Amino acid sequence: MSSQDKVAVVTGAAGKGMGRSIALTLAREGANVVVNYLNSKDRANEVVEYIESNGGRAIAVQANVFVKDGCEKLIDVAFKQFEKVDICIINPGAGWHPEPLDVFDPVLALEDLVQEIAPFFHLMRLLLPGMYERKWGRLVGITLHPMQSSPAYSYNVGKAARLQAMHLAYEEAWDQGVTINAIAPGPVSHFESFKQAIAYCNHEKEWSQRKNVSPQDIAEVVTFLCSEAGSYISGSIIPFMFKK
């Protein structure tokens, strides 16, 4: 699943979940990684330091990908450092407002909706011209399993909007050599420590002994989609199941 010398932007890559594991796994396969974060500077630097200590290249970039200026800042830094972006992972999403429909706040719900689709819209516009020119690109979004909706109505609507936005874009992008795919998990637990995330990424015994879906499960499939092996997969919605 080599991604040797590809440049990957992973948004929301400094948390304890999927984004961080995706960044680590893409680096494991040879990609140069832009580790995006909003507030978690120390955790972002931890990811970068680990990648570099293992022979890879990575940078941490603070940027709010829910707004146009933040997306422009992120990609500008990526271009200055690596000259291109081949892979972009749309990971972070909306807030959490699980209020019942009769009392939910429409203003907050609309904010949730915008936060789910804004990163894809802004980053797609910034990245597709270069990807089209090179006839190679990968866009992958983290959405939500349609059969495992959460208690938060606006969160569910936002994830559905992101999923549909990506699905409606894939055919046009495919004609230019760019694949667009969506990952649709249900609940996914976080890793308790950075050490645990590394152990899973390196397929140590914790990986083979796992009892439920983990951030690394998502990272492995995302990395496959971003490799040459995933060249002929586009428009897919890949679900992950959670053992209750």
Regions found by a protein language model. Name each.
Residues 2-34:
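Canonical Rossmann dinucleotide-binding motif of NAD(H)/NADP(H)-dependent dehydrogenases/reductases
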Residues 17, 98, 201, 210, ...:
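Short C-terminal tail/terminal secondary-structure segment
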Residues 72, 80, 93-110, 151-154, ...:
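Conserved mid-core segment of classical short-chain dehydrogenase/reductases
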Residues 82, 122, 136, 214-240:
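C-terminal substrate-recognition "lid" of short-chain dehydrogenase/reductases
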Residues 102, 171, 175, 182-217:
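A glycine/serine/threonine-rich, flexible loop-to-helix segment
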Residues 102-122, 133-140, 162, 209:
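Catalytic Tyr-X3-Lys loop
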Residues 174, 179, 233-235:
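Short, small/polar-rich loop/turn modules that mediate ligand/substrate recognition or access, typified
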